[in-house]
Amino acid sequence: KHNPASEILSGLVGSEMCIRDRKEGGNAIDAAIAANAALGLMEPTGNGIGGDLFAIVWIEKEKKLYGLNASGRSPEDLTLKYFIENNFKSIPAYGPLPVSVPGCVDGWFELHNKFGKIKMRDILSPTIKYAEDGFPVTELVSYYMKNASDNFQDYPNFKETFFIDDSTPLKGQVFKNPDLANTLRTIVKSGKKGFYEGEIAHRIANFVQDQGGFLSYDDLKNHRSEWIEPVSTNYRGFDVWELPPNGQGIAALQILNLLEGYDIRSMGFGSADYIHHFVEAKKIAFADRAKYYADMDFNEIPVEYLISKEYADIRRKDINSENSAPTVSPGNIENGDTIYLTTADSEGNMVSLIQSNYRGMGSGMVPEGLGFMLQDRGELFSLDENHFNVYAPKKRPFHTIIPAFITKDGNPFISFGLMGGAMQPQGHAQIVINIIDFDMNLQEAGDAPRIRHQSNQQPTGGEMTDGGELALEKGFDYKQIRELMKKGHSVIYDLGSFGGYQAIMIDYINKVYFGASESRKDGSAIGY
């Protein structure tokens, strides 16, 4: 019998609510929904019911992984022609135009209907209580809310929902959101129809359209999540799992496939040799990401070929071990966005879940009286009509948020994730390498200094012409940095944007869970 249960997520209060659900007879799936609901209230800077959700679920009795894509689609009445005729070069970051259907609530019910044990009323009641009675705002959330407020103060209902008196909440202030409490009560009473049909859906659609947007009641009513098969590659005997596009998870698998051809262990963690090869592999994976990753309902994307060893062997020939590549083209495939949480229970079930509004709080669109902000994922469409990720009605945008999972010999090993936009697949690959190649434990793998490469080559357009920038977190040796510069890398120091990692590992023989949550963000590992 599995003795422990474990939850790792942002914020101690949210973690405690997970454990409460588990003690009252819930399982890892119930706990994940409870945690996500709590974080939507307590960390509106990263997620909420106005956003999307992705999950990978391990069901022990079936020895099977399930994948859930709960991302929403673009408005049916908004066309590419509208953007072109109005001279848009890209879709705006804020306002009504980047708003797509929020998929989170439907994702909750898909997870709950398939795997949940206790009633949704019991899952959401703690969050409803905290929304009514209030909770102390943490230092980090206070900081991010203040930063975000500059973008949103002129939008209707933002101050009424997220301000205390004349400003965003300060550290330690008790914040209440009674409107969100009422929205969650409606969801408890009427299920997902209470959100996607009826008064709430009408309020959302009417508000967005009043602000000049196109999201309609029918867009909300017709929304459906999709159960999908996770995809994997084997890295030195471990199967690493991600979800296929419209997300970016397979970039991590491409990076790992490319690096498997090198003796990473002998290079050593933090060496110029390792960092150089990692960055060059990342450039190749992200060149494909920029061109091919998009909604698979609109494109024939040979995912299995992109993550194959055969393709990696071809692309690895483009890596120069001595020099940084200034430009990288996507491969020829004709032959072939946040909070993260993870939960586990005494039955051996595990959930890897990530959820986000994109750009922190989202679009700035706060429908009156509902207590949440709508996401702005639509910003991540391209307006190039020849691009895989070109905008189209009823299409899912490219997504940055990705959950991950590792199995070994058909058994669960690690449920993990890492927040942070384009950092996510880079971070996933680094966590895997830290554990498998560099023999780090679960906590060390997250605490180790990270590498982040960035360039203009994105799924919305742009090209890398100068090799991009290599950002290194504090902790790397200066001699190694000089060697990287000699290889042609443009190296910068950066204190932020290296993601936020959390994980649960299971010792499958002894039936013991290990948890890890890093210091780059609020978060905790808790169990009973």
Locate each region found by the language model.
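Single conserved hydrophobic/aromatic residue that forms the stacking wall/gate
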Residues: 1-14, 19
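Noncatalytic scaffold domains of N-terminal-nucleophile
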Residues: 15, 23-24, 28-190, 195-197, ...
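Active-site rim segments in enzyme catalytic domains, especially the processed small/beta chain
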Residues: 41-67, 214-216, 349-414, 438, ...
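Short, small/polar residue-rich loop motifs at catalytic or cofactor-binding pockets
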Residues: 227, 335-338, 399-401
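Glycine-rich phosphate/pyrophosphate-binding beta-alpha loops
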Residues: 241-249, 342, 354-365, 418-425
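M16/insulysin-pitrilysin zinc metalloprotease superfamily fold
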Residues: 249-265, 406-414, 422-446
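Internal maturation/activation junctions in enzymes
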Residues: 261-356, 369-370, 377, 495
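Extended C-terminal subregions enriched in glycine
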Residues: 395, 428, 437-496
